[in-house]
Each structure stands twice: as structure tokens, then as C-alpha cells.
Amino acid sequence: CDISNLVIDENARTVYLSDPDMSLDVGSVGKGYAVEMAAQAAEARGLKSALISVGGNLRAIGTKPDGSQWSGGVEDPWNASDVYTASSSYVSGVNMSDMALVTSGNYQRYYVVDGVRYHHLIDPDTLWPARYFDSVSVLSPDSGAADCLTTGLFCMSLEDGQKLIESLDGVEALWCTPDGEVIQSSGWADHEKK
């Protein structure tokens, strides 16, 4: 397989794989979409309170039965383990109801060649793993949108990402940079656990 066999027609907004042995993995957005569809189906059947957790994607339906908000955490990418548990360290905790919290990062899905770690989030400009961030998290009413946004934000500059997030109603983001800085969008703190 060769990246040159990926034919992108921006005008027609199409993608074509000219090599029949190639396939496209939609995992970067498919999981968020599936979580959102599951949440919407559950709500349509009358479910009023739930927290759906699917590998880095959290989707809150309503509030907890006691009326309090659900809690979610953004795992510390610099001290991450292979499996997120209650004892994992985090850089931000959020309260949420009828919201999704999705994180994309470079610390769980990667491989090492000659001592160099290569993660799975590819910068479309360089065709190499993106180097802007160690993780990006998004809060959004829609898990599918949040999943798309985390992947996209991971592959763009902080300035461009901040402009994008600030242009979207009801959407917030948190960026963890390779130098250990945690940067929040203007409304992230409104959701942060006190």
C-alpha cells in the first residue's frame, strides 16, 4: 500500500482508493458516531439517565438519578497507563449532562521503531504523526462531532484550533502540549469540577 493510492478530490469532496488492497479505517470518527447513535436510540426508548463509556468516548444522558451531573476525566497523557481506571491521574475533571467528552492522544495507540514512537494520528500536511499535542479533548453535545473535532484539532496548530472551537456553540476543548502545558478553551472552566 502506498499513500499515493489515496486520491482526494477536494472539489468533489470525494476520496478514492486506487489500490484494491487498501482500506480506510474510520475508527477515528466511527466510534464517536456509534456512541452518539446508541445514546440517541436509548433516549428515544425513554432512558433518562446513563453514562456511556466506550474507549476514550464518554456520553452522558441526562443527570445521575440523584440529579447531580456525571463526572468525566481527561487522562494525564504524560502519566498514562494502558488502561484508564479510577486510580488513573488526570489533568482535568468535568461535570457533564447531555454532553460527550472525547479525547484523542498519542499515548495509547502507537508503535516503536528504532527507539522512535509513532502514533496513529497522521498530519495530512506531512503524512507523519502529528506533533502539535500529546492529547486533545472536546466537550460537545454530540459524541460524533466531538470525535471528529479531537482528531482534527490534534492535527492543527493551537491558534487554528482555538479559532475553530470558539466559533462553535456549546463546544469546548482542552489541549495538552508536548512541553507539559494544559490549555483550555474559554468555556472549559464552566464544566470543570470544583
What are these model-derived regions, one by one?
Residues 1-194:
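Mature catalytic core of soluble alpha/beta enzymes
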